[in-house]
Amino acid sequence: MPLFKRRDGSGPAPNATIREKYDFRDVLGTGAFSKVFLAESKSDAGQMYAVKCIDKKALKGKEESLENEIKVLRKLRHNNIVQLFDTYDEKQFVYLVMELVTGGELFDRIVAKGSYTEQDASNLIRQVLEAVGFMHDNGVVHRDLKPENLLYYNQDEDSKIMISDFGLSKTEDSGVMATACGTPGYVAPEVLQQKPYGKAVDVWSIGVIAYILLCGYPPFYDESDANLFAQIIKGEYEFDAPYWDQISDSAKDFITHLMCCDPEARFTCQDALSHPWISGNTAYTHDIHGTVAVHLKKSLAKRNWKKAYNAAAAIRQLQMLRLSSNSNRLQKQASQQQPEPPTPAFHA
């Protein structure tokens, strides 16, 4: 039975298979359930696409997630969002015909650059804010903004930034969002606290990315997930000397408004776009590449703060820690026959 009622086009699905429409070339990437191929249109010679090929057997039980991703991508048409052009639902595989993006990941490109300034970082964040603001205006929350999902469109020096991977995205009309999801280090406090949340979680993630763009290392880091989450929930980060001494006060103010623990007080995308660090000329223009690149290389090598994770399982772990902590406290109270202050659930 087909997963999808129709292709991306307005008419009924054609009888032609994807391989009658496209020539498949090299494998661009491989995931747990899919491969991405370079493909050329047979009707428009030289027009190249990225085709995501998803095995239906591996997809079993996850159909709703894929349907959601396709629904979101069909809804979004923006200069800084990777486009979905077509879908093919065939016997063994589902195919997504996507815009081809060849410029590489954000942080890898910064490391390879010869020079890099605070103003460059401001321009990058502006593009992300414009795209995410467009998503939010259309009722879509990405929920997994991180450097790996920010790609350069091509190899040109002035290439635009593209947002990709909408696998965890959700539309506001699909109900209250409370599912724990995202990536360690980039997830907002309210998600970890299991509170209902909305668009503000994306703004927090942009704040984390902006922080890293200006120093090369993440604002929150710990080998222990429990400690990492405790830092995030409390909003415990610093603008460390000497690395932040060369960064403008305007940039620090901007980040503080994005990484605000209270989602109600946190900037919206429009608020952020109006901040002088984005809309004015307060971003410094001196070269910070040396410092940023050194730290980025170290951070990228660790990969611990980049890995994907099962947030629901992580939160269950934190709940167990809390229960264990409370149990130990009660046992100690009983043995000493005197009150004792509560043990905190987290340790930063």
Curated annotation (Swiss-Prot):
Residues 339-348 have a biased composition (Pro residues). Residues 327-338 have a biased composition (Polar residues). Expressed in head and tail neurons and vulval muscles. Throughout the nervous system. Detected in neurites and neuronal cell bodies. Expressed in the mechanosensory neurons, AVM and ALM, and in the interneurons, AVA, AVB and AVD. Expressed in the right and left ASE neurons where it functions cell-autonomously to control salt-avoidance learning. Expressed in FLP and AFD thermosensory neurons. It catalyses: L-seryl-[protein] + ATP = O-phospho-L-seryl-[protein] + ADP + H(+); L-threonyl-[protein] + ATP = O-phospho-L-threonyl-[protein] + ADP + H(+). The keyword Kinase applies. A motif (Nuclear localization signal 1) lies at residues 7-22. GO terms for molecular function: ATP binding; calcium/calmodulin-dependent protein kinase activity; calmodulin binding; metal ion binding; protein serine kinase activity. This is Calcium/calmodulin-dependent protein kinase type 1. It comes from Caenorhabditis elegans.
